[in-house]
Amino acid sequence: MIAQVAFAILALSGAGLLVRTLENLKSINPGFDTGSILLFQMDPTLNGYNGARSKGLYSELLPRLEAIPGVVSVTYSFDSLLSGNYWDTSFRIEGETQNTQHATLDLAAGPKFFETMRIPLLAGRVFSPQDYPLPPDSPWKPAVINEDFARTFFKDQNALGRRISGVGHQGTSHEIVGVVGDTKFRTLRSEIAPTLFVPAGGGEAIFEVRTAIDPRTIVPAVRSAVSHLDNNLPLFSIDTQTEKIERSLFQERLIARLSTFFGGLSLLLACIGLYGLLSYEVTRRTREIGVRMALGARPADILRFIVRQGIALSAAGAVLGMFGALAATRYLASLLYGVRPDDPLTFVAVATLLGVVALAACYIPSRRAMRVDPMVALRYE
């Protein structure tokens, strides 16, 4: 019985930590508005488009998509935020005496990217239509950085107007024209990191379409707009930002549900075991209970007598289970987010739940013991 209670505590503690992890991840503010965004992927290069033709296609497609009823704004980028992918690049800061090579996340973004994703502008400006396309021989291309980039590499200095070079495999040079708010980049779990945004060119792209209605309802209109320009261009990975985030939490949700199921099952078995044990004890000690009542014990005294046994067993199992949980939950550390393996709130909640269930399991045997007739009990063999 003690082992059953201990295992229930162990299972419920793990389940509690995993459920709290899931809730913490779902409540994260990723730094942009994830609601009402339709995502779809295009790769014109598969149909023989070069970079220049891709840019022309995108410039024609954007106003067509914005003309769809219910569409608020449209943009595109090399990859979507929270895609699970990791894109980084190296660069140097012009004017640094040591000419240090730095590293940052980077994302090529199209017109109205920050407005569509609702990433707040903190200083300077975001990309303008004049930034698409820039002349190939333009010495300094515009760049927008996030707040963490400015904080990491420029400290308390003004980042606007600063120049960086050697960006990407082409070693391009950029002038910082704006600073925007921090966003989660790869996943909800990923830490905020320095991020560099540059104007997107042609080639493969993810389109982000913000709507005032259910994003799924405009999919036929989006397909029609694309096919009107080129009916041989396929759309890939049609999705909504919300659904994409929900799917990214599939593992956490599955583990939380399974652990909750097994935790609840172990608690139920412990409850049944405690009830069965106390029922057996009441039957076995019926004569003793009758003697106690004949000697003046009140029903409330009998109630306390039986409940005390159940609580003692539960407490012993709970203490053993708590020590086991403290030792075992540290192996869950890699699965947790926003909660420590030894989180006191979780352990207190589990102990409270066990106490309530234990009292409920003690109730029926205790009630039966209170109703024992002393005269019948004294003749009980």
Positions of the model-derived regions?
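Small-residue-rich transmembrane alpha-helices
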Residues: 20, 308-370
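Conserved G/P- and acidic residue-centered "switch" motifs that form tight phosphate/ATP-binding loops
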Residues: 124, 146, 296, 321, ...
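N-terminal membrane-entry
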Residues: 249-266, 308, 312, 344-349
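Mid-to-C-terminal secondary-structure elements
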Residues: 59-251, 257-260
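Alpha-helical transmembrane segments
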Residues: 7-36, 279, 331-341, 366, ...
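Membrane-proximal juxtamembrane linkers immediately C-terminal to transmembrane helices
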Residues: 23-43, 67, 120, 190-191, ...
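Hydrophobic alpha-helical transmembrane segments of multi-pass inner-membrane transport and secretion
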Residues: 1-21, 253-287, 315-316, 356-360
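Intracellular coupling helices
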Residues: 272-313, 371-379
